[in-house]
């Protein structure tokens, strides 16, 4: 096969494969776009119906059933983790290996615990049963006289099976591992790449807990290079219902800088006081001088950093922000947070510097675009609703974030943009309003299958046109990875901008991925000849096959050629869409994506975190 073009990319960017002449017929493009959007609403409902119809013949305790059922919800609570460890590690417990069957006619008695693998009960168990990271199946004729606790799996009682006593089922896997003596212990949470270079020490003096921290800014970019963050944090609890915190951080920017537009040192000092935790309300305030990213809903900071450090590809733009913000937030429930804030800050342009990169170090970094400099006053309200069972390894739940911001300025110094993008904005009495919404749904279909869905929308809502630092684009491996970085910027034809700035008023995109756990393990298993319970595995023990689809559009809003009316979104036949496949091992994922609405090449990319 003749290679037409190749581009080497790293984590956080993409590898371009040989160009392809394949194009999806235009008659099919609208259908593919519609399916991408329809998938967000139709598929979850159809799956729920099919699941219900398939369960007529057996009793299944479903952890996602309504609250009225005998079902536990939410993340695996700490008290349940403690109970699991206590049950399994009890010297009086009978420990069963995973994948065992209690045969018909046999009987086990006492306190019984099993780790990893399904437990089938066709005989009789007299006593309590704990199953950790496995399923429990009570076959026809099987009887359990006692309480049951299942974590990391489901429980099925076939017709003719009996379970007497309390039954508690959590589909969330227990983060535990087997130690050399056969007991279980809690596994430390896997740290993200950005947290690896972190050192901290925590100690307490009376009611005050102090944490000293030295870390990076969890990124590397063409403005700061590697930012070193350091400073103390103090926590004080004068009573059970009052929590206070003061966090002071200095920021040292290591990239050389001869520009007067950026200091080598920044800071952030934040204070919070919260009442009636975890429910109740709180008051917070922060003063800061920091480099802030534009379009921060795209790639995480650590993946941006690795791409910049390794291949001199910084897929984000930045500006200098110095100011003060005050906030008032409420927790009507453990899952819901509502916040109102007011802010006064200086926002200024910054130039790209020339930090070192491992590869392509002799090349020139992409320029950082100019922004609309000025002092801005803003007021905003934000809502976050989070029912995820885990923040680090989510398998089910909702995560919804949204906000409205109204900003004003009396001394803005605007960048001159083509009139096709925006008319000149006023330098006095300038005001705008913008909206953002990020809606995510995680579904656990079975022990091995997941379906994750996302809808993001944002942009101009009212007032004058948005400032450059609030504008949007589409394209790149975090949004629609079948397309190159900033495939849509809303720049008019013939407009040359080496910074490739995002200029769109609004953007919307949808993402869907189906994840299936593969029976693949990479690594080494240490076998204990005398006790199977002491077997240990080192390596990658979980790999997911990922099928993905994305669709989205960014545009200019208003009246006139090339614009979409304010009360409408673009028709689906104008959206860009892609399909892809990949493998995710948790700490790294490799993917292939192909645009289905344009003749783009197949793109290969690597992610260091889940897509969303």
Language-model features: where?
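Outer-membrane beta-barrel initiation region
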Residues: 72-91, 97-99, 103-104, 152, ...
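Arg/Gly-rich low-complexity intrinsically disordered repeat tracts
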Residues: 4-33
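Outer-membrane beta-barrel "beta-signal"
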Residues: 380-383, 580-581, 585-588, 601-612
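Extracellular beta-strand scaffolds
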Residues: 99-101, 107-108, 118-121, 125-127, ...
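Outer-membrane beta-barrel strand-turn architecture
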Residues: 236-240, 275-279, 330-334, 387-389, ...
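Transmembrane beta-strands of outer-membrane beta-barrel proteins
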Residues: 245-251, 284-288, 339-343, 401-405, ...
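Bacterial N-terminal signal peptides
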Residues: 33-48
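C-terminal outer-membrane beta-barrel translocator/porin domains of Gram-negative envelope proteins
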Residues: 258-260, 282-327, 360-539, 549, ...
């Amino acid at each position: 096969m003749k290679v037409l073009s190749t581009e080497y990319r790293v984590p956080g960017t993409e590898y371009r494969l040989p160009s392809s002449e394949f194009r999806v017929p235009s008659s099919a493009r609208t259908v593919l776009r519609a399916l991408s959007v329809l998938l967000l609403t139709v598929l979850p409902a159809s799956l729920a119906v099919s699941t219900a119809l398939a369960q007529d013949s057996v009793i299944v305790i479903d952890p996602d059933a309504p609250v009225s059922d005998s079902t536990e919800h939410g993340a695996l609570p700490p008290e349940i983790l403690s109970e699991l460890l206590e049950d399994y590690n009890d010297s009086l417990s009978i420990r069963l290996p995973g994948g065992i069957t209690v045969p018909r006619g046999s009987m086990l008695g006492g306190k019984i615990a099993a780790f990893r693998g399904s437990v089938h009960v066709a005989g009789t168990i007299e006593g309590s049963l704990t199953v950790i990271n496995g399923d429990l199946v009570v076959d026809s004729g099987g009887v359990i006289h006692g309480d049951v606790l299942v974590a990391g799996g489901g429980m099925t009682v076939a017709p003719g099976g009996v379970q007497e006593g309390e039954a508690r089922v959590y589909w969330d896997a227990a983060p535990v591992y087997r130690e050399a003596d056969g007991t279980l212990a809690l596994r430390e949470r896997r740290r993200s790449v950005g947290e690896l270079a972190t050192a901290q020490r925590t100690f307490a003096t009376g009611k005050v807990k102090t944490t000293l921290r030295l870390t990076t800014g969890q990124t590397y970019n063409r403005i700061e290079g590697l930012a070193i963050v350091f400073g103390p944090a103090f926590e004080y609890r004068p009573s059970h219902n009052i929590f206070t915190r003061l966090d002071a951080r200095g920021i040292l920017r290591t990239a050389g800088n001869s520009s007067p537009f950026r200091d080598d040192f920044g800071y952030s000092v934040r204070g919070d006081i919260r009442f009636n935790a975890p429910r109740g309300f709180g008051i917070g305030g922060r003063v800061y001088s920091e480099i802030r990213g534009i379009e921060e809903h795209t790639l995480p900071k650590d993946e941006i950093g690795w791409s910049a450090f390794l291949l001199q590809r910084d897929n984000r733009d930045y500006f200098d922000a110095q100011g003060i913000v005050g906030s008032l937030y409420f927790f009507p429930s453990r899952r819901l947070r509502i916040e109102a804030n007011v802010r006064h800050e200086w926002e200024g342009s910054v130039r790209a510097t020339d930090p070192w990169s491992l590869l392509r170090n002799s090349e020139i970094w992409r320029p950082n675009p100019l922004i609309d400099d000025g002092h801005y006053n803003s007021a905003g309200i934000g809502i976050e609703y989070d029912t995820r069972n885990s923040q680090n390894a989510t398998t089910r739940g909702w995560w919804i974030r949204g906000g409205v911001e109204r900003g004003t300025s009396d001394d803005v110094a605007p960048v001159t943009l083509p009139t096709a993008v925006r008319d000149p904005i006023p330098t006095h009495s300038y005001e705008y309003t913008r909206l953002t919404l990020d809606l995510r749904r995680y579904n656990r279909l079975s022990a091995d299958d997941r379906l994750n869905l996302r809808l993001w929308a944002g942009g101009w809502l009212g007032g004058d046109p948005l400032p450059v630092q609030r504008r949007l684009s589409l394209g790149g491996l975090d949004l629609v990875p079948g397309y190159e970085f900033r495939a849509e910027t809303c720049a008019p034809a013939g407009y040359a901008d080496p910074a490739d700035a995002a200029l769109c008023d609004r953007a919307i995109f949808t993402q869907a991925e189906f994840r299936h756990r593969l029976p693949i393990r990479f690594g080494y298993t240490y076998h204990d000849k005398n006790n199977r319970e002491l077997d240990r595995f080192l390596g990658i023990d979980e790999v997911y096959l990922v099928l993905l689809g994305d669709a989205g559009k960014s545009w200019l809003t208003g009246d006139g050629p090339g614009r979409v009316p304010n009360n409408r979104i673009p028709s689906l036949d104008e959206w860009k869409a892609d399909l892809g496949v990949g493998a995710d091992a948790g700490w790294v994922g490799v993917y292939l994506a192909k645009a289905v609405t344009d003749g783009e090449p197949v793109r290969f990319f690597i992610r260091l975190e889940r897509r969303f």
